[in-house]
Amino acid sequence: MIIENNKKKALEKALDKIEKQFGKGSIMTLGENRSMDIETISTGSLSLDIALGTGGLPMGRIVEIYGPESSGKTTLTLEVIYEAQKKGKICAFIDAEHALDPIYAKNLGVDINNLLCSQPDNGEQALEICDSLTRSGAVDLIIVDSVAALTPKAEIDGEIGDLHLGLAARMMSQAMRKLAGNLKNANTLLIFINQIRVKIGTIFGSPEVTTGGNALKFYASVRLDIRKIGTIKDGDIIIGNETRVKVVKNKISAPFRQAEFQILYGNGINTEGELITLGVNHNIIEKSGSWYSYNKNKIGQGKNNACNFLKNNPNISKEISRKIREINLIK
């Protein structure tokens, strides 16, 4: 008993010393740390929000979205910006690829007049801008498109053909160490879009690797693998992609879940189509033959007509979405 009391006194003394030196709240029990209640931003896809387990992407963390070309990476991040702006959050887009289309962003609902945009000259400049925006405490969401385009200054200044082994990986590693703590303190969500490469000589396992070294993999709380799995046709004309997103890493909920949804060219994620599919799966919407019904009222014959009904009746769409979220314990 005496030993236990001595331990308790020694612990209290140590905690007091730490708090005097580093400030109140620098150390506490895990139960006292209210940051466990993680705020999230919707991805714009209800099925992906469900797969993430918390209703969206976590604030104050690093997220990596990667996949092949034209798989929907930028579209998904623009949908996240739209959802964040709906909540009144300030967003920034670091366009390292110099390829952001403002007209397309506007079509997806993004308020381009209130979206901060930077087209940096090199990788160090891009990451420094990210850090400055984060430390300001005023920006809630930052998108970097893409890691592969974050070219180190030494490589830009050098000749084509010069060897610059590991420069990008070292740059990313240093940036991650600096950014991780600042993002947490500012409660800023940082999303990196990344490309994939094929590793030559791989015999076992997947030959696909992401660019920029391993630091981003370790520091990311969520990693999403996005792939095109099919096309959507209107007659002979291709109007969109069938898309699958796999949650490869998830520090805030269970990983390895996946979501499937449609991305329509020029319009983004087909949210009404998702509501129909999820509504039928959860017995919220009834399907009899080709007819769809909600609350015993027919809403359309065929999925396209049912989608048009939901598009023209946003209150019913919100009601169905709320019921699906309640079933899946998403706020």
Curated annotation (Swiss-Prot):
Which BP terms from GO are recorded?
A: DNA recombination; DNA repair; SOS response
* Family designation: Belongs to the RecA family.
Q: Which Gene3D superfamilies match?
A: P-loop containing nucleotide triphosphate hydrolases (3.40.50.300)
Any one of the GO CC terms: cytosol
Question: What protein does this entry describe?
Answer: Protein RecA
Domain of life the protein comes from: Bacteria
Q: Which PROSITE patterns match?
A: RECA_1 (PS00321), RECA_2 (PS50162), RECA_3 (PS50163)
Q: Name one GO molecular function term.
A: single-stranded DNA binding
Q: Where in the cell is it found?
A: Cytoplasm
Q: What does this protein do?
A: Can catalyze the hydrolysis of ATP in the presence of single-stranded DNA, the ATP-dependent uptake of single-stranded DNA by duplex DNA, and the ATP-dependent hybridization of homologous single-stranded DNAs. It interacts with LexA causing its activation and leading to its autocatalytic cleavage.
Which residues are listed for ATP binding in this entry? G67, P68, E69, S70, S71, G72, K73, T74
* Pfam families given in the database record: RecA, RecA_C
Could you list this entry's UniProt keywords, alphabetically sorted.
ATP-binding, Cytoplasm, DNA damage, DNA recombination, DNA repair, DNA-binding, Nucleotide-binding, SOS response
Main subcellular localisation: cytoplasm
